[in-house]
Amino acid sequence: MSVEFFNYHINWKSKAIHPGSHKSDQRGMGIEFAGHSNLLDYPDPRRIDLRMTMRDPMDQVYVRIFNQRSATPIMIFNDLSASMTFGQASKLERAAEIAEIIKNSAYHNRDAIGLVGFHDTVNDEWIAPLSYRPYLTESLIKKITSEKNHNKGSHGISKLHQYLPKDHTLIFFISDFHIPNEQITMFLNNARKHTVVPIILWDKNEYSNLPKFGITTFTDPETFEERTILLRKKLIKNIITEFNQRKKHLIKLFNSFDAPPFFVEGEFNPDDMTHYFNEYYHA
């Protein structure tokens, strides 16, 4: 079975010393020309520029300096709340699949990766710090599908700022974002120095594949309360309208923070994520 991954790039210069695949400010053995320096300041005889040296009236020896390609930190924030258990193939199963592909992509680019899972709180057992050896992140990804956080909400989003890395980080935020707008806005404000990619998991059975008529029982996954309602054409239309309005609002909210959302309402296609980066984050 082939390993799935997508191609991504960043539109800022990494500050990481660790070699990788992205543009950086670090001097090294790269191919991006950064200028000249005196040999005494940058003692690397392999980089002597004879033409520049011969033209200098002060007889100084010059070397060419280049920027190396560096790694960049990658974080996954994964919603583990009760609403993520919805569906015959739950959103958590889809989240685990996507997180695995993100991990593969980071490994392919030689980037450090970490993961934080949350529901109403952030537990220590759901924290994998940034590392170039993604064993802990991988072990948490395998646990995602077994989470059964009935009666758990997503208030832990208000604690995520404590786990934001110091340096500019590419953050993949996996959630259905059935989260109050104020809490989403607060997180985005706290994460302004980072680049956030919201991956929004919705299940069409939540709103579009409802029975056309009849009595049905809904269970709120976060309060665990049951409600019996009579489905009729007008109510179904209202439900669909509300979801469409919610989608428009999320797009507007995330775009206002330069964080275009990526919606997943079925199978996740890594190629679509590659196209997303090509469209929104030019190298």
Identify the function of each model-found stretch.
Residues 1-25, 166-167, 185-283:
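Von Willebrand factor type A / integrin I
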Residues 133-169, 182, 201:
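Von Willebrand factor
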